Amino acid sequence: MATMLKVSLVLSLLGFLVIAVVTPSAANPFRKSVVLGGKSGVPNIRTNREIQQLGRYCVEQFNQQAQNEQGNIGSIAKTDTAISNPLQFSRVVSAQKQVVAGLKYYLRIEVTQPNGSTRMFDSVVVIQPWLHSKQLLGFTPVVSPVY
């Protein structure tokens, strides 16, 4: 009878430990901190070909949109340097992704401007692989803080 009680107690404790390790909680050291719908970092950005190609796509789309907007203004705008010398993609320097109705990427991209200087831009792009869709949502220059 005492042996049966010990076995029952050991099995109960073992079951409790298994549940404690498997159940996600803030106290669980094995749990990865992920917030549903939250942003997560993208590892190995420099060597990640998909992310670098996505950055190049963002710059190309921005250049195309700028060219289309300038072309709609009139013949004077067609001599603008933004059209004859568009931004050149250099590299993606940081990236985060978020699961939405697809994947939303937040990229910080280094570009070379027509005058040869480099500048950072933040871009947002959504990919929906099942629709074969990729859409640039935003492409804005990073403003350096003035101290």
Curated annotation (Swiss-Prot):
GO MF assignments: cysteine-type endopeptidase inhibitor activity
Motif interval(s): Secondary area of contact: 98-102
Annotated positions for site Reactive site: 37
The organism's place on the tree of life at top rank: Eukaryota
GO cellular component: extracellular region
Function: Specific inhibitor of cysteine proteinases. Probably involved in the regulation of endogenous processes and in defense against pests and pathogens.
Descriptive protein name: Cysteine proteinase inhibitor 2
Organism name: Arabidopsis thaliana (Mouse-ear cress)
Gene name for this UniProt entry: CYS2
